[in-house]
Amino acid sequence: MISHNDPKFLFVHLPKNAGSSVTKVLANYIGVDREELRPQKYKFIYARDIPKVLDNKQDDYFIFSVVRNPWERTVSYFHYLQQIRQPPHNLDKNVKFSNWVRAGGHRGLQTQMSQLADKFPCSVSTHIDYIARLERLGEEWPKVCEKMGIQCDMMHDKKSKHQNYSDYYDQFTKDIIYKFYKNDVDCLNYEFNKE
C-alpha cells in the first residue's frame, strides 16, 4: 500500500502487479523517496481495512489497484523467487516451473480477490474506485493520473524478462493455477491465452 495526502490517493498494492513501478512513478512525481509513501505497518492491506487505514476518510481519497492475469502473475512470481537471495524465499535456478507448481510453490502468492473483496468473494470492495489491468496499464495509467489530477508517465521497474506465460504450462499445471486462483479468473474476467 502507498498513500499520500496531496494528491489524496491510496494504492492497494497486490504483489507481482506492477506495484514497484507504480510506487516509483508516484514517488518521483511527488518528489519523495518511495519508502516515504510505503508505511511499514500497512505494506500490504486488504480492502476491508481501508477505512481503518484512512481514519474513515476514504471518500476523500482516490483508491486504486492493479490486477494481472493469474497465470502470468504466477510465472512472474516464479522468476522473482529465482532472483532473490533471501532464504527461505529464494528458489534454486534449476527448479522447473512445472515441478514448482505441482509442489504448490504458487501458494505463496495469495489471490488478488482476497485483498480486493469486501464481504463477498467475487465482489470488489466499494472502497476501491478504480482497478487497472496490468495488461493494459499503458492505456489505463493516464486515466488513473487524471482521476488523481496529476500527469506523469508510467515506467516499468523490476520487469522480469521471460517468454510468454502460456509457454510455461501444460494442461495439468494450467488447471492447478485455475483451481487455486478461480476467484481471480472468474471475478476479474481472465482467461488463459496462447498469444
Question: What annotation goes with each model-predicted range?
Answer:
Residues 1-195:
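Membrane-interface amphipathic segments in extracytoplasmic regions
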